[in-house]
Amino acid sequence: MRIYKDIITGDEMFSDTYKMKLVDEVIYEVTGKLVTRTHGDVQIEGFNPSAEEADEGTDAATESGVDIVLNHRLMETYAFGDKKSYTLYLKDYMKKLVAKLEETAPDQVDVFKTNMNKVMKDILGRFKELQFFTGESMDCDGMVAMCEYRDINGVSTPVMMFFKHGLLEEKF
């Protein structure tokens, strides 16, 4: 299994257990699904509670959301109220990534710059449909992943987008 972590914060962003697609060599699109989980709900197969005693039950907590977000403890951020604030973040973040690439993979700098401009124009055009997520540390200096709902086979499906060059791949 591979875990993809933010190269700036070290936060776990996603794993290869989801359907992934690399777009224009710079964005991973990771397809998730909406799930509801109940914590604290104890069910024992074949268990028959006594009719004589009142069932005290357990405190069960329920959480719903995108499986990628829940499994990797991503945190929704509302830091970008408009396109302009998101564009400012992107420019700063891209500078950080270019600096990292120049150190670690200089051959990828031109690929990144060229393809990223194209991809970002497309993403900025859909800005109003996006939700934004940081890693568990909630550090906006690192990667801010995007989530958009797409109609896939008639079902509204969450698709998370992550910057390939902002990720460190670890094998487990």
Curated annotation (Swiss-Prot):
Keyword field: Calcium, Cytoplasm
Supply one GO molecular-function term: calcium ion binding
Where the record annotates domain TCTP, the positions are 1-172
Location (main, coarse): cytoplasm
Q: Which GO terms describe its cellular component?
A: cytoplasm
Database matches in SUPFAM superfamilies: Mss4-like
Q: One short Pfam family name for this protein?
A: TCTP
The protein's matches in InterPro entries, at most eight in alphabetical order, are given as: Mss4-like_sf, Mss4/transl-control_tumour, TCTP, Translation_control_tumour_CS, Translational_control_tumour_p
Q: Where in the cell is it found?
A: Cytoplasm
As for family, the record states: Belongs to the TCTP family.
Q: What does this protein do?
A: Involved in calcium binding and microtubule stabilization.
Name recorded for this polypeptide: Translationally-controlled tumor protein homolog
Which organism is this protein's natural source? Plutella xylostella
- Lineage, uppermost ranks: Eukaryota, Metazoa, Ecdysozoa, Arthropoda, Hexapoda
- Protein's gene: Tctp
